[in-house]
C-alpha cells in the first residue's frame, strides 16, 4: 500500500511518499522532499508569512514527490496530512492542499497527529521495540510511553517548548536562521568552555524553560563589546564570557533537565530504551548525554538523522497509512486542523 503525506505545521513544508509492503515488513521510503521558510536573523517566522510560503511550494513539491517516487496517482491509497498540533495558518494551508488533491484524485484523506507521526517514524527507522520517547521540537516537549493503545504523556513542558527556548535565544544573539537556529546554536556551543550558572527548571516529571530563557537573555546583555570592561559578563575567575559560552551553558542545562525526567520515566515503566524524536532530537550533544544515561542503566538510546528528526512529509504518510489500515478515514467535512492536538488523544489501533 502507498500513501502520500503532507506536513506543514511550522516553517517547513514536507511531502513524502511511502510504501508498506506488508505486515511486519520495513516501510519503503519512495520520496521525502522538504522546503523551509527562513526568516532574517533576529526574527522568528510569522504564521501568515509561513502559510504564504507553504502555498507557494506545496504544488511543485507534490509533483516532484510523486515523480521521484515513480508511482502513478492510481497507485496511491490515501492522502495523509498534519491535522495538528502546530501553527494555525500553516496547518490550514496543508489541510486545504490535502482536500484539493483528494477531490482531484478521488482518494480518501487521513488526518494525522504530528507528534504520533514523529514517534512512528522514529520506531520504523530505528527498530526500537517499546521505548520511552523523548519528543523535543520547536513547539513540543514531552516524555511519552506506550500503554493500552495510547501514547501516554508522563512529563512535558509547563510553558514553552525546548526548541522555542533555543530559537528565541538565537534571536537574542542575532544568530542566523539558516539552515535552522538550533543547529547554529549547537555549533557555537561546541566552542564554548565556560559553564555559566542558569536556572534549573525541573518540577517533578515536568520542565520549565521560560525562566532559563529570561536569565540567558539577561546575561546576553553583558556580551555587548561597547560596554566598559568592568560591566562586561565575566566568569568567577574574571574571564570574559563569550556567546559560545552562553550557548554551551544553555544546552548543558536544558539537556540535563531532559535527561533527568526521561530517566525517571524509564524507571517508572521499566524500559531500557530511549527514542529521541523531533527537530531538537538531531542535536549531537543531547544524543550524547542521553546515551550516557541510558548506558549507565544498561540500556540504549535511539535517534534518527535530520531527514526524519526534522519535520517531514514521510512521517505523516507513514503514520497516516498505519491508521488507514485500521479503517480510519477522515470525512471531508472533518478535514480541519487544530493547533492543540495532544499525543494521548490518538487511539493507536495498529499496536497491540
Swiss-Prot record:
Gene: KAE1
Assembly and interaction partners: Component of the EKC/KEOPS complex composed of at least BUD32, CGI121, GON7, KAE1 and PCC1; the whole complex dimerizes.
InterPro entries assigned: ATPase_NBD, Gcp-like_dom, KAE1/TsaD, Kae1_archaea_euk, Peptidase_M22_CS
Cofactor mode of binding and number, as noted: Binds 1 divalent metal cation per subunit.
Protein name (record): tRNA N6-adenosine threonylcarbamoyltransferase
GO molecular function annotations of the record: chromatin DNA binding; metal ion binding; N(6)-L-threonylcarbamoyladenine synthase activity; nucleotidase activity
GO cellular component entries: chromatin; cytoplasm; EKC/KEOPS complex; nucleus
Membership in a protein family: Belongs to the KAE1 / TsaD family.
Residues holding substrate: 135-139, 167, 182, 186, 283
Job description of the protein: Component of the EKC/KEOPS complex that is required for the formation of a threonylcarbamoyl group on adenosine at position 37 (t(6)A37) in tRNAs that read codons beginning with adenine. The complex is probably involved in the transfer of the threonylcarbamoyl moiety of threonylcarbamoyl-AMP (TC-AMP) to the N6 group of A37. KAE1 likely plays a direct catalytic role in this reaction, but requires other protein(s) of the complex to fulfill this activity. The EKC/KEOPS complex also promotes both telomere uncapping and telomere elongation.
Cofactor: a divalent metal cation
Species name: Phaeosphaeria nodorum (strain SN15 / ATCC MYA-4574 / FGSC 10173)
GO biological process, alphabetically ordered: positive regulation of transcription by RNA polymerase II; telomere maintenance via recombination; tRNA threonylcarbamoyladenosine modification
Keywords (A to Z) from UniProt: Activator, Acyltransferase, Cytoplasm, Metal-binding, Nucleus, Transcription, Transcription regulation, Transferase, tRNA processing
Main location: cytoplasm
Amino acid at each position: 500500500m502507498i500513501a502520500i503525506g503532507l506536513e506543514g505545521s511550522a516553517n517547513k513544508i514536507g511531502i513524502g511518499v511511502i510504501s508498506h509492503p506488508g505486515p511486519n515488513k520495513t516501510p519503503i521510503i519512495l520520496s521525502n522532499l522538504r522546503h523551509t521558510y527562513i526568516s532574517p536573523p533576529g526574527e522568528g517566522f510569522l504564521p501568515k508569512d509561513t502559510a504564504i510560503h507553504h502555498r507557494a511550494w506545496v504544488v511543485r513539491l507534490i509533483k516532484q514527490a510523486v515523480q521521484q517516487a515513480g508511482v502513478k496517482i492510481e497507485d496511491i491509497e490515501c492522502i495523509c496530512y498534519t491535522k495538528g498540533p502546530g501553527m494555525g495558518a500553516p496547518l490550514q494551508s496543508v489541510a486545504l492542499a490535502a482536500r484539493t488533491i483528494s477531490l482531484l484524485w478521488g482518494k480518501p484523506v487521513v488526518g494525522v497527529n504530528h507528534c504520533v507521526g514523529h514517534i512512528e517514524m522514529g520506531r520504523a527507522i530505528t527498530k526500537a521495540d517499546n521505548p520511552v520517547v523523548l519528543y523535543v521540537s520547536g513547539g513540543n516537549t514531552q516524555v511519552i510511553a506506550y500503554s493500552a493503545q495510547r501514547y501516554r504523556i508522563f512529563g512535558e513542558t509547563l510553558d514553552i517548548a525546548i526548541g522555542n527556548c533555543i530559537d528565541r535565544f538565537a534571536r537574542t544573539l542575532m544568530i542566523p536562521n539558516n539552515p535552522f537556529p538550533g543547529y547554529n546554536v549547537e555549533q557555537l556551543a561546541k566552542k564554548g568552555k565556560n559553564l555559566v550558572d542558569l536556572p534549573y527548571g525541573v518540577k517533578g516529571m515536568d520542565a520549565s524553560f521560560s525562566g532559563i530563557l529570561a536569565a540567558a537573555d539577561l546575561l546576553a546583555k553583558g556580551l555587548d563589546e561597547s560596554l566598559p570592561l568592568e560591566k562586561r559578563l565575566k566568569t568567577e575567575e574574571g574571564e570574559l564570557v563569550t556567546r559560545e559560552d552562553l550557548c554551551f551553558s544553555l544546552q548543558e542545562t536544558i539537556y540535563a533537565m531532559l535527561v533527568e525526567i526521561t530517566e525517571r520515566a524509564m524507571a517508572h515503566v521499566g524500559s531500557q530504551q530511549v527514542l529521541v524524536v523531533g527537530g531538537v532530537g538531531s542535536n549531537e550533544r543531547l544524543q550524547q548525554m542521553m546515551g550516557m544515561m541510558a548506558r549507565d542503566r544498561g540500556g540504549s538510546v535511539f535517534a534518527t538523522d535530520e531527514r526524519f528528526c526534522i519535520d517531514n512529509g514521510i512521517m505523516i504518510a507513514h503514520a497516516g497509512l498505519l491508521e488507514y489500515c485500521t479503517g480510519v478515514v477522515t470525512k471531508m467535512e472533518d478535514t480541519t486542523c487544530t493547533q492543540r492536538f495532544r499525543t494521548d488523544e490518538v487511539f493507536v489501533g495498529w499496536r497491540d
